[in-house]
Regions:
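Alpha-helical interaction elements in eukaryotic regulators
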Residues: 4, 14-17, 75-82, 126-129, ...
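A phosphate-binding catalytic loop at a beta-strand-loop-alpha-helix junction
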Residues: 146-166
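Cysteine-dependent PTP/DSP-like catalytic domain, specifically the C-terminal lobe
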Residues: 137-140, 161-220
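Solvent-exposed, flexible loop/coil segments flanking beta-strands in beta-rich domains
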Residues: 206-230, 235-241
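Broad hydrophobic/π-residue packing in well-ordered secondary structure
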Residues: 16, 56, 112-114, 132, ...
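Cysteine-based protein phosphatase catalytic domain of the PTP/DSP
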Residues: 29-149, 171-182, 191-195, 233, ...
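Structured alpha-helical bundle/scaffold domains in large eukaryotic membrane-trafficking regulators
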Residues: 23-26, 145, 196, 217, ...
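Scaffold helices S1-S3 of the voltage-sensor/voltage-sensor-like domain
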Residues: 1-28, 89
Length: 340
């Protein structure tokens, strides 16, 4: 009986070990599939036993998604794996730039070689923060020729691409925003997996890369003089597909330095004046309507790039630029701001 029981226990132990191995193997496969699903066709690092949402944009610039712990590491880069990778490949020579305003981690994971430049998701950095960022990178790179930077936001695409692109311009890899943006997109996109573009797509982010190129190439690293401007009017063109189509159900909120400085409810025209304009285009049956708002907004300081007019077409506006919204935002949809 004892011999049979011993044999049974050994068999049961072997069975349990096999099951644990199978479950562990299955978990790894599920994690791998989940990370692939979330990262889509972003170029991943799959060498030396690593599988990370991480791309060498240049030999000393890395873009990656957020280094996560806990349940988020199931579908994002596990922070311990990122540490293992960087300590193996670039020991003592890497610096992390965390662009997430919404999330952080213990900097001691990366030997406290971390600097934060918080940017809200789908938003842009200020020009001042752009200048601070490139100054910080220059200082780090000049300390040792082996030094590298690792830049991340949450997905390692929009905010990450914005800041890496301005660094590529600052370090003379490229002269224009267009060249820099195209290059980052090509490096971050794994075309063998899918043709979906994984570069900077948000219009405002691309526009701010252009602003940075302007500061470097035209203003020779000096921000243009800050000027106090008053918003004279805001005009929204071709509004017939938005809400009621006459602008009366719109609400306009202006935010500066993450603070709401002005709100206008178009239904009551509180804090502003407005009118709806309909115009029949010559040689066309299309009615083009627009809403014109006259603001009593107090003056605020901004960095001024002439002229005193900002006109943004549908393709230059965040969200209306997406094809899936074009049943709402028609082809001639645009926003115009006049200043004085």
């Amino acid at each position: 009986f004892i011999v049979r029981l011993t044999f049974l226990l050994k068999y049961l132990r072997l069975f349990m070990l096999i099951k644990i191995f199978q479950l562990s193997n299955s978990k790894k496969k599920i994690e791998k599939a989940a990370r692939k699903l979330v990262s889509e066709n972003k170029r991943r690092y799959r060498k030396d036993g690593f599988d990370l949402d991480l791309t060498y944009v240049t030999n000393n610039v890395i873009a990656m998604s957020f280094p996560s712990s806990g349940s988020r590491s199931f579908y994002r880069n596990p922070i311990r794996e990122v540490v293992k990778f960087l300590d193996l490949k670039h020991p003592g020579h890497y610096k992390i730039y965390n662009l997430c305003s919404e999330r952080s981690y213990n900097h001691s994971y990366f030997h406290n070689s971390v600097e934060r430049f918080p940017i809200d998701d789908h938003n842009v950095p200020t020009l001042i923060d752009m200048m601070r960022f490139v100054d910080s990178v220059f200082e780090w790179m000049e300390k040792d020729p082996n030094n590298i930077i690792v830049v991340h936001c949450m997905g390692g695409k929009g905010r990450t691409g914005t800041m890496i692109c301005i660094w590529l311009i600052a370090s003379d890899h490229f002269k224009t925003a267009k060249e820099s943006l195209e290059y980052f997109g090509k490096r971050r996109t794994d075309t063998a997996s899918s043709s979906k573009f994984q570069g900077v797509e948000t219009p405002s982010q691309s526009r701010y890369v252009e602003y940075f190129a302007l500061v470097k190439n035209k203003y020779h690293w000096a921000l243009p003089q800050s000027q106090t401007l008053r918003i004279k009017s805001i005009t929204i063109y071709s509004i017939q597909g938005v809400g009621k189509g006459n602008g009366k159900d719109l609400k306009i909120v202006l935010i500066m330095k993450k603070k709401i400085i002005y709100t206008c409810f178009c239904s009551s025209l509180k804090s502003c004046q407005g009118r709806s304009v309909k115009r029949l285009e010559e040689g066309s049956q299309q009615i083009v309507n627009k809403v014109l708002l006259f603001s009593r907004l107090r003056k605020h300081q901004i960095y001024y790039f002439p002229p005193l007019r900002l006109y943004l077409h549908r393709n230059e506006l965040d969200n209306p630029h997406k094809q899936k919204t074009w049943n709402i935002y028609h082809e001639d949809f645009a926003v115009e701001l006049l200043f004085n």
